[in-house]
């Protein structure tokens, strides 16, 4: 009798998991039909110009590097090293957290207004997350893949606040995180529909570890560093119903090879959706 009860329980859990996974797949259907995530919003720099150009080229998924300004507003900047000389902090002011992401004390940073008035290389206009939200209201078909460079809880609370908890905006936010526990933090803030986990060299984990996290947290997208893009790893992900985006890829012939082993899409600086042939 005990064995029968245990067996029934296991079957129920399996059915529940499959229902949840199918639900997540349906929710993410708007995302997975696209092959390209624009790295740094497109063009190698988190800028207004890169964002607009990538959209014009058919790209609809955008990787947004989120940091805080001096006045506590979300701004987009991949690395502080990339904007040295434009603001008052120096290279010596940059320190690194436990996953090797550069940080600067907030008091040394520009305000949101100062940041957004800055043009990198006299051509790229810096943007805030508020700017992105306004564009999301106009472009109803875009999704923002959020890369929280600072505290996850503070970042996602600010995302929701900046979007005025508007479901039309927040339902097109892709929560993309490194740590399993961070998904619990984010789920307590808002029931985001799209979840992705990152497998990069700065936090090494095996495919089995990633798969187990995906099962536990109901994640169905994996953002994989190219160092992990071997046939066995990708096969394991696909066999478990996961959608795989490789990062960062700027060689379209390499992407073709990745697609042959099951990779669904890539994070890229200079490859756009209009360059991709349907497969």
Model-predicted regions and their roles:
Residues 1-279:
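Phosphate-group recognition and catalysis centered on beta-loop-alpha active-site segments
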């Amino acid at each position: 009798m005990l064995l029968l009860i245990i067996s029934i329980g296991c079957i129920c859990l399996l059915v529940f998991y499959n229902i949840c996974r199918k639900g997540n797949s349906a929710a993410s259907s708007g995302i997975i039909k696209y092959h390209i995530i624009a790295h740094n919003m497109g063009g190698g720099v988190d800028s207004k110009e890169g964002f607009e150009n990538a959209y014009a080229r058919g790209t609809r998924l955008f990787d947004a590097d989120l940091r805080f300004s001096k006045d506590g507003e979300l701004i987009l900047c991949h690395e502080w090293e990339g904007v040295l000389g434009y603001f008052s902090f120096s290279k010596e002011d940059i320190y690194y957290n436990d996953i090797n992401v550069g940080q600067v004390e907030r008091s040394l940073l520009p305000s949101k207004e100062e940041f957004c008035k800055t043009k990198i290389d006299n051509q790229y206009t810096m943007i805030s997350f508020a700017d992105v939200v306004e564009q999301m209201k106009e472009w109803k078909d875009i999704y923002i893949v959020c890369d929280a460079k600072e505290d996850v809880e503070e970042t996602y609370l600010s995302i929701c606040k900046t979007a005025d908890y508007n479901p039309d905006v927040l339902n097109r936010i892709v929560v993309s995180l490194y740590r399993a526990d961070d998904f619990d933090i984010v789920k307590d803030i808002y029931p985001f529909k799209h979840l992705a986990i990152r497998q990069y060299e700065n936090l090494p984990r095996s495919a089995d570890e990633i798969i187990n996290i995906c099962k536990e947290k109901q994640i169905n997208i994996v953002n994989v560093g190219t160092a992990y893009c071997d046939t066995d790893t990708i096969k394991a992900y696909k066999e478990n119903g996961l959608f795989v985006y490789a990062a960062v890829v700027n060689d379209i012939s390499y992407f073709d090879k990745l697609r042959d082993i099951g990779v669904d899409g890539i994070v890229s600086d200079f490859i756009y959706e209009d360059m991709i042939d349907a497969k």
